[in-house]
């Protein structure tokens, strides 16, 4: 009889401990710790320039870390290429998706990995497989022969996720998959992130939107200027706290005061100041309602992954 390891007690699929990356004398990433296990979603949040892209490149094998450790299933690694990461089951779905808009869905699904029957492509098998794999992810397209460019942004993201899963991904790195999508299409992508999680995959979800991260995430890492502001499990942080840290917290209040002081110069500035005042007030109310003291910016009281 075979037994399946409990994902809560198994060795994480990916773990970084105190990882960093220097480009010469420039520190791009410093002291970052995270992990993702099977059937888990780890969300990495940060504004532009926070270090999210550098982190992705380290995990995906594009760049090598210069400090700390990077482990895959407990084994220290330092990938020399994305192919090495892919061979270990780590696949990245980038924002540009690497699809050809005028080609049909099934052709994009197998692009570069075509099924062959002798010297020719086995088109029937590729159509059939693409259709079934998409259905398994809950994606029911009208016709896999339609050009992928006719799909919505959310549907294209989901095809890319299903493609990565089909070709052996055990860890999915999703590079801001909801960044350019509306509310409805973002919901579609979040639904398929949950589908991937339920199939036992580990997901690293890169985003700048805590409202997208919190409903699907199990762990949360916030980056700012290449450093970690904190690393929490879901029961250790609230949506309000994540939003406050992402919004800048004290920086937002300082901006509010600056706008108030400049408000006498025009009604437009006064209106902007009022909006910021309302946002700051809502954050404070939400934090008090959560019954906890919000984590202070720059203080990481839970830097390392806690043992079960």
Task: Set out the residue ranges of the language-model regions.
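Long, low-complexity, intrinsically disordered segments
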Residues: 286-308
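Glycine-rich phosphate-binding loops of nucleotide-dependent enzymes
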Residues: 2-287
């Amino acid at each position: 009889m075979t037994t399946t390891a409990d994902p809560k007690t198994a060795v994480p699929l990916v773990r970084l401990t105190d990882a960093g990356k220097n480009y010469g004398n420039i520190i791009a990433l410093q002291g970052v710790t995270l992990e993702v296990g099977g059937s888990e979603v780890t969300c990495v949040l940060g504004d532009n320039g926070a270090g999210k892209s550098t982190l992705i490149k380290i995990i995906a094998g594009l760049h090598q870390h210069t400090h700390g450790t990077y482990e895959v299933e407990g084994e220290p690694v330092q990938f020399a290429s994305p192919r090495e990461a892919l061979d270990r089951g780590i696949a990245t779905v980038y924002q540009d998706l690497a699809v050809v808009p005028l080609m049909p869905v099934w052709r994009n699904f197998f692009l570069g990995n075509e099924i062959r029957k002798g010297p020719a492509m086995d088109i029937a098998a590729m159509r059939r497989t693409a259709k079934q794999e998409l259905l398994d992810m809950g994606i029911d397209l009208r016709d896999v022969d339609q050009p992928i460019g006719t799909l919505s942004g959310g549907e294209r993201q989901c095809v890319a996720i299903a493609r990565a899963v089909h070709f052996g991904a055990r860890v999915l790195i999703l590079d801001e998959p909801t960044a350019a999508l509306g509310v409805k299409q973002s919901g579609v992508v979040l639904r398929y992130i949950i589908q991937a999680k339920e199939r036992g995959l580990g997901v690293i979800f890169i985003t700048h939107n805590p409202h997208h991260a919190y409903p699907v995430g199990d762990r949360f890492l916030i980056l700012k200027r290449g450093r970690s502001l904190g690393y929490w499990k879901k029961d250790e942080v609230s949506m309000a706290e994540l939003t406050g840290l992402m919004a800048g917290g004290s920086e937002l209040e300082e901006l509010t005061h600056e706008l108030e002081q400049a408000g006498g110069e025009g009604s437009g500035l006064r209106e902007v100041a009022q909006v910021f005042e309302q946002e700051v007030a809502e954050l404070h109310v939400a934090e008090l309602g959560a019954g906890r003291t919000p984590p202070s910016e720059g203080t990481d009281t839970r830097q390392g992954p806690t043992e079960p």
